[in-house]
Regions:
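Generic detector of bulky aromatic hydrophobic side chains
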Residues: 3-10, 36, 40-44
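Accessory terminal helices/loops
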Residues: 21-34, 40-121
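His/Asp/Glu-rich metal-coordinating catalytic cores
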Residues: 1-20, 24, 53-57
């Protein structure tokens, strides 16, 4: 959403340059093109949204509005990500994402587990 900006790029395989180029491809579509977001982290003063437009993003996105070049975006994204805490669900998310969305195989008791190291964090 325009008021929240773009996704962080400090996860495994993340790349601010790749994200910027991908976003710019989307923002080259006609202004009235509807964009449906996979999730939203709204500020407390607004409800969750799932839809925006190319026009709205190009005019109002705090990270990638028109006039922001790749170098400026990469610097902003890298500096911002450096200061963010690790997300609460990063360890289970990585375990599922690395398996292309599939859960780990079930163990002997028939249950699949996402395992979290307790002495590493």
């Amino acid at each position: 959403m325009p008021d929240v900006g773009t996704a962080r790029c400090d996860f495994p395989g993340g790349d601010a340059s790749v994200l910027f180029k991908s976003i710019r491809k989307l923002l080259s579509l006609p202004p009235e093109t509807r964009l449906f977001m996979c999730h939203d982290y709204p500020p407390s003063e607004r409800d969750v949204r799932f839809e925006t437009t190319v026009r709205e993003e190009r005019e109002q996105n705090i990270h990638v509005h028109d006039g922001v070049d790749e170098e400026r975006y990469i610097e902003m994204r890298t500096n911002r990500d450096r200061g963010l805490a690790m997300p609460v669900l990063i360890l289970p998310a990585v375990q599922i994402n690395i398996r292309a969305g599939h859960f780990p195989p079930a163990e002997d008791n028939g249950t699949a587990y996402v395992k979290i190291p307790l002495n590493v964090l």
